Amino acid sequence: MRPTAIHAVVAATAAAMMLTGCASDKPPVCDSLDAVRHSADELRNANISENGMSVVTSDLSQLKADLAQFANDAKTQFQPQADGLRSTVDQLQSSVEMAKAAPTAASLGAVRTAVTAVGDAARDLRDAVAGTC
């Protein structure tokens, strides 16, 4: 094989490897964001009237775990948005505890409002990370 042909083969192979690497290499923060989004969606879609508060409690625990992993992966890069989501999750936790203690229309309404706030904060986080993922 001539040197020019060898260089062409090497260049083509290197280019293919780089393109393959670009397609599959995404930062860990992207995977943890996907987990946060999935957990937030599960929480938003929880049917309290059908499944009770236990489904919200379970979904909330998963979201907290996913958010902790996201914060670990993101370090300080998306801290304001992660803190905003964490704050709304804490508010939801309080609303859930109050609704468990006194399941009234008002306390269940507060849970629904808090779930909506969590969804909004999750969207803010997703929008902030969009350029990275």
Could you say what each language-model-derived stretch is?
Residues 22-25:
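Bacterial signal peptide processing site
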Residues 1-20:
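Sec-dependent bacterial lipoprotein signal peptides
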Residues 27, 31, 38, 42-120, ...:
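Surface-exposed, polar/charged faces of alpha-helical domains
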